[in-house]
Amino acid sequence: AGCLLVFEAFDNAAGRTVIRVKDARMVVAAIIGVLHPTVAPPAGIHPTAVVASSAQIDASASIGPHCSVGENVVIGAKTVLHASVTLYSGTRIGANSIVHAGCVIGADGFGFVRMGDSYRKFPQVGHVEIGDYVELGANTCIDRAALGVTRIGDGTKLDNMVHIGHNCQIGKHVLIAA
């Protein structure tokens, strides 16, 4: 290499040309972003998506193929739903969020009440609120609250296959990996 990108504390340059930076990983990520920019999908609703008439979708959002958007769903500006995402009724997603393929948001949580020798389903009547700049990995599931709200805070990132149970409150800028 003609030049090495190294942490500030790197002390073994041995005559090589180096560029010292505070956070080499962050700088490399920025360089890769310039060399390989992300191409956002076009705004709009794919013709195979099924969208309830009461859903409110910002004109700059992108709804991918085979998505299902339920009653009273709200989707913010520049949010992207990739293929086969399901948003149950009442789900709210903020701006600039990315929901990868196969996510299910707002399905019933695992709520049951013992009734003698059997179980009865505990009604799940809450909803899900997802903040701004959230990214949900493929096939992530977030259950609606039994009562109230299941919440994912601004800037939070969830890995593929993560499951968030009903009534969970995930704060801002949290990373969760499966």
PLM segments and residue spans:
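Structural signal for interior beta-strand "rungs" in well-ordered beta-sheet cores
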Residues: 44-178
